[in-house]
C-alpha cells in the first residue's frame, strides 16, 4: 500500500508544535555522529601520542557544528522533494513544523559558530576545509548534482568523505597522504551504500524526479554497480596495511568486514525480494563504523605478522 505524502504550505508553520527536537532532527544527528567517528579516527591516526583534549574537543565540536549546518541546509533545499517521499515526508519542514527562514537562521548560526571554533582554537586549514565540505554537500551536491545526474552520489560523495582529513589536519595542520587514503575509502564506500537505499526506495525517487541510478539505468544495472564498487572497496581497503599505515588487526578486521559487504552485494545482485537492498544498506553502515573502530584499535594496539 502506498503511503500518502504531502507538504504544508511554505508560509504556514505549526507554531504550537515547534520544539527543539525538530531543529535537532534537522541536523541529522546519526549521520553527524558517524562523520565525527571518522574525524576522530583521523585525529588519532595523525599522532603517535595522545591528542590534546583541547584540540580534540574543539575539532570535533567545530566539525560537528558545520556538518549539522550542512544537514539543515539540505533539509531546506530538499523540503519539496522530501514531501513526496514516504521515507522523508515526516521530517519537520514537510510537516510545517519549522519555516525555511528559521531553519536557515539556525544553519547560519551553526556555520558561524563552528567556523570560529575551528579558526580560533584549531587552525585555519581545518576551518577552510570543513567550510568547503559544507559548500560541497549543501550547495554543489544538494542544489545541483542531486537533481542533475545519476552520478550525483559518486561526485558529491567527496564532501561526505572529508571528515578523516579534517580530523587529521586539526592535529597536524597539514594534508597527508594517509589522510587522503582514509578519504578514498569512504569515497568508494559511498556509492554502494546509497545505491542500495536507492533500489529500496526507487519508486520514491522516481516520484520526486530525482535521477538516482536505479531510476535512470535500471535496478539490475545498479545491482551490478554496487557489486563492482564493493569489490573495489575491498581492494582499496588493503592499501593502509600494504603501505605500513596499519597492522595485522586492521588487515584481519577489514578483510572480515569487506567479506561481509561482498556477501550482501553478491546476494543483492541475484535477489528478487524487496528486503535484501535494505539489508545491504544497513550492513554498509555497520561496515564503515566498525572499520574505523578497527583502525583506532589497530593504531593503539599495533602488531604485525
Swiss-Prot record:
Biological process according to GO: heme O biosynthetic process
Coiled-coil regions listed in the entry: none
UniProt membrane topology term: Multi-pass membrane protein
UniProt KW keywords: Cell inner membrane, Cell membrane, Heme biosynthesis, Membrane, Transferase, Transmembrane, Transmembrane helix
Reactions the enzyme catalyzes: heme b + (2E,6E)-farnesyl diphosphate + H2O = Fe(II)-heme o + diphosphate
Entry superkingdom: Bacteria
Gene Ontology cellular component list: plasma membrane
Disulfide bond keyword on record: no
Compartments it resides in: Cell inner membrane
Record-linked Pfam families: UbiA
Pathway annotation: Porphyrin-containing compound metabolism; heme O biosynthesis; heme O from protoheme: step 1/1
Cystine pairings recorded for this chain: none
EC number, as in UniProt: 2.5.1.141
GO MF annotation list: protoheme IX farnesyltransferase activity
Transmembrane segments: 31-51, 53-73, 103-123, 125-145, 152-172, 179-199, 231-251, 277-297
HAMAP family to which the protein is assigned, alphabetical: CyoE_CtaB (MF_00154)
Role according to the record: Converts heme B (protoheme IX) to heme O by substitution of the vinyl group on carbon 2 of heme B porphyrin ring with a hydroxyethyl farnesyl side group.
Further facts: Carbon 2 of the heme B porphyrin ring is defined according to the Fischer nomenclature.
Family of this protein: Belongs to the UbiA prenyltransferase family. Protoheme IX farnesyltransferase subfamily.
Name used for this protein in its record: Protoheme IX farnesyltransferase 2
Organism: Pseudoalteromonas atlantica (strain T6c / ATCC BAA-1087)
